[in-house]
Amino acid sequence: MCLYSQNIKPLVADTDIVVYKHLVKRCNGNVHTPHQDTQVTLGQKFVAKGKLPKLPKNYSNNKIGEGVIHAYIDKTTAKSYLSQGEIIVKAVIKADTPFFVQVDMTEIAATEIVLDDDFQTYSEETVKEIEDNLDNTINVIYKLLREQNTHNGVSVGDYVLSDKSIVAPDALTKNMDVIGIISFFTKDGTPNVTALKQTECIWGRLTDFAVNVVNSLEKSVEDFNGADYTKKLYETYKDRLDDFPALKYCVEYETKGTKKGDWVLGSNGEVLQTVRNAYLINRSIEKLNEVKGDCGYADKIITGPFYWASTESGSITAWACGTGSVGDYGWYGKWVGNVVRPSLALGKTDTGLLSYVKRLFK
């Protein structure tokens, strides 16, 4: 069993956090893990075998296999096992224990956990306890994820306003004009801003040639040239934008404080880093929609579908990234319908966009 982590570096809490472990009971009465079939002892520390992996910073591989013990942090999953009569045991990840969290925030994987000395039994009190415990666990993880994704006082999930100021989720008020959300930082610390809205469309009609070719996985995850690529695509196809819906949606996107042409179709590396941080972005979107009193004010990043990038792999294929496992980025036919979400990203030659983003973060 593997976990596909959203955090590149292990998280470490300064307090104990509660999780829930699904187990199975054999005919001989022994208790085992359901996937690796490892026998465990209730009331004892359960330590993982193997070495904790080191994930690459470019997120080209987010798969966590050996070196960790899996458990659930999703309330719905834990309660479902409990209601079906499955064995669920409360467990604790002790303070200072390294752990990773699943992209969709359903599972956690730590180097060790301490199992409770008895199974959970179904009751209203138990259900309430599970909900309270996991709400607390999720909030601890959320704060750790924001801390790990902070640069110069700005965090992934912070709001960018139309007046170019930046506001943390806790400081948001209804009268603020939010235009985007910080989605990741480049190697030099420059923040990328993802739009509040998205659409589903094809990348474009088939052509005889490609404009922005990157034809290897290794190069695609290091590709942060979305502004340049968008500019080149626009210069090539500006007289036939209707044939390239993904490009058209991004270059025509505008908000209060921005104009058409300020937003771009991100490159593969930019899109991959954005969807990796989907949980932090979506938490901020939930808060924004709640404060605005409009559930459709901003669109959440969707788990499952793929997001188009401006990076091409050939005349008939382009790159797209999903919100799941390590395999969720690759080449797809340009006629396929995927999700498109504009961003404010830096390009080496796009001086207009460069000055705009620098003004944002003075």
How would you describe each model-predicted region?
Residues 21-28, 92-94, 195-197, 311, ...:
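Structured loops at beta-to-helix junctions and adjacent beta-edge loops in soluble globular domains
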Residues 268-362:
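C-terminal, surface-exposed recognition/capping segments
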Residues 72, 265-268:
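Short beta-strand scaffold positions
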Residues 1-55, 60-69, 76-141, 360:
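Conserved NAD+-utilizing ADP-ribose enzyme module
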